[in-house]
Amino acid sequence: MRNLRGIIIAAVFVALTILLRLLGDRFNVLMGMAYPFASKTYMEIVGTWVGKFDFCLWQIILVVFCVAVVASIGLMILNRWNFFRWLGWVLAPVSIVAFLFTLVWGLNYFNKPIHESMKLEVPDWSVTDLREATDYYLEQANQYSVSVHRDDNGDVILKDLDTLNEILSHSYDNLVWEYSVFAGPRGPVKALGWGNLCSSLGCDGVTIGLTGEAAVNMNQYTATVPFTMCHEVAHLLAFAREDEANFAGFLACEYSDDMTFRYSGYLKAFLYCADTLYEVDVAQWEEVWEKASQELRHDAQAMNAELARWEGKTMETAGQIYDTYLVTYGKTEGVETYSDVTGLLVAWYIDQYRPDTEPETEPFDPTDYEEVFPTEPPQETTAPTEP
């Protein structure tokens, strides 16, 4: 029994983690009243302390753990330790971390949808709605694509990471004035270590709720970095679902005072909508792309080139693992949830930018004598009934 203690501890924490997820799913309305606030408060407190380090603390912890596991394998062989005892004490800390991760951040997957918090109506969109939204985001992206600073190769030039974090913070501050749901921690977003490894895994950014750290892979093409930073901070703001983090990241970019952030947000919004349009109507997709500016085309090609550079079995396997992780938290679409942001982007366009075709009616003015006591009787709007 002594040799199974670690395995028993691991099993207990796995069971507790599963129980937490079931409770979060079952009582999501009740939990949504307090959990997001508690989660954001925890990440703000821990993130403020961890933010003093330029490196990602979780990466250091991961390296130490991996080295300890490898060293323990050698010790197990030399000292002839019981295999199940060794396995238990490896699995125990992993299961404890998984439990704590779910406790302080993971239950955000069961929060109410972002559009409900924003009181944004998300209708079932048509191809016409999608085309209009795609055209709008392309128009905005075209406008900013010629305004951002570029180098001799035509690539977007970024400011240093500290300055980008300041801009990001102000961008979310602007957004909070309209929607208080975006109040909370702002990072700072760190540069992700092991950039080449992360690129081979298809990782542009990562947020670890347990340490309150958001990080961005600076190896990605520069035009997408501001959007990715805003996306990762959205995870700190308790938006766990990838489509909602994408939408929050776009809104932060749109509300930014910096044209590079705005361009990054509109570029990604256009690409998400265009990809969905391609799936439903290739001809319209081709028509849209014909209107793209040369600068935007250059950026899209640079993004594709960077992706092609790292594509392979490693990225495919990493995608499958992350897909499984999302499914375990109830996101049956897996990694496809990233592109689900299209519905939110179309809804935002309809709510904010689609021209209103209904005639505006003058509001009633109680101080206007003619309105209060009209000289002519009001016109009947329905046909009179026969006696």
Segments predicted by a language model, with ranges:
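Active-site recognition of the HExxH zinc-binding catalytic motif
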Residues: D54, V225-N246, F250-L251
